[in-house]
Amino acid sequence: MESKQLKWVLLTILSLIWGSSFILIKKGLIGLTPIQLGSLRIIFSALFLVLIGYKSVSVLTKSQWKYVALTAIFGTFIPAYLFALAETEIDSSSTAILNSLTPLNTLVLGMLAFGIPFKRNQFIGICIGLLGSILLVFNGASNHPEQNYYYALLVIIASICYATNVNLIKKYLPSVAPLSITTGNFLTLLIPALVLLYCSGFFEIVAISEVQTAMGYIAILGIVGTGIANIIFFKLIQLSSPVFATSVTYLIPIVAFFWGLLDNEMLTPIQFVGAFVILIGVYLSAKK
């Protein structure tokens, strides 16, 4: 398959996988704390990747390991806990929509930190996207007083972390095999995640049936939604551009929205408008 066709196939697969991740986080939080959920997500991913990719890290040089560690922190470690904490207060559909700010943040960071030039339509897109996110958050806060929309800031911070990760990979690890990067990421994070899981009191509640059910959801999230998805994502970055790769977040809210409907989540008409405004902004920022 040609790279032009392959990148669209990978984009579609990623949108289905990551669009389903938010409902898995929501279900996992029924029996787990955010720290436990984030730690288990990393641990399940690490165990899976060690089994299939332990030989792939031998090709990494000392200088590459530095950037692998950085991408592990920004691309996985921080977001894993921020998303889990955010979904204790806001619904999974809104979380997925706010995550679609990632391409905008990728563009901004690319300009400010990595010297990537921008065009007028991209700047306009950034402004429109920010307007949409503000509309979404403030309307959600007024219509869902039981939810704490200050936690939406955690999702925005996570999207900035993702944007940092994408730019680092494109600039410093463009020729490294995706499996090597992904396996290296989770080997770096395995011990910190185990320490946090132990300190969270997880092993005192592991026998509870509700906790075991939640672990099943997070095992799927860790292996498919994190381990396999990251391999696909890193390949997509190398085949395309940082902004195209992060455009997967255009499609993620659509998948997440349908999962949310099945779980009795509802968005207000104004939130739909906010989501649409975000997508317009993202489209303009990605347009060449």
Name every feature range the model reports, one short phrase each.
Residues 48-58, 103-127, 254-273:
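C-terminal transmembrane-helix exit sites in multi-pass transporters
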Residues 1-36, 85, 144-171, 195, ...:
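Glycine-/small-residue-enriched transmembrane alpha-helix faces in small-molecule transporters
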Residues 38-40, 80, 94-101, 168-190, ...:
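Helix-helix packing/entry segments at the starts of transmembrane helices
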Residues 23, 49, 106-108, 112, ...:
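Transmembrane alpha-helical segments that form core, pore/gating elements
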Residues 17, 21-22, 50-99, 135, ...:
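Specific transmembrane alpha-helical segments of multi-pass solute transporters/efflux pumps
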